[in-house]
Amino acid sequence: APGEDITTWDLSRILSEIDKQFQKTLSYHEVLKKQAIGDYDFLLNKGNVPESYRPTLYDFLVHNALLFYSAGEQAGSKAQDSFVLSAESQVFASAKDFMAWEIDSEDDESPKIRAIKLYQDLLNFHKNGENKDAFIEADLLRLRYGYNQSFGEEKNARYKAALKRFTQKWPDHEMSARAMYRHADVLRGEGELL
């Protein structure tokens, strides 16, 4: 087994350690959900994402974890990720159905399953909030995640239908413009004239 000298670690060990740290940190989710992100401005480089999209320390950490679990490097980090995300699954369902989805898999360490569960928890956390920005953005991001990670003949059709449903549900929200762009991008990829 590799020692504690990080300079001797291989990719698998590095990714495993990052995963452990995210799991440990996110195990304090109840505390993190109560910590306003603004209280940590002096520590964080938040970029250009409005605070309403990442209102708590939990949001900040979950979105970073989602970037990690969605990264292509994950594919080579484990002997196998037995979970295959089907386009026919609930990944493109309504937010309500997606949140209720119970994944039938024994592979609890799958990066895909970890990402799906984080999206479910994030959506559940924000579903009843006064400000819907964090919920709406997380919902659009999970649809994009589904498009990037799923397989199946109906992938494009299900993604386009989900984006259409999204824009109909949130017609006046700025994220609808992003959803329309994603829809147009899929059409362009299919050779449709726009």
How should each PLM-predicted stretch be described?
Residues A1-L194:
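Extracytoplasmic/secretory-pathway proteins
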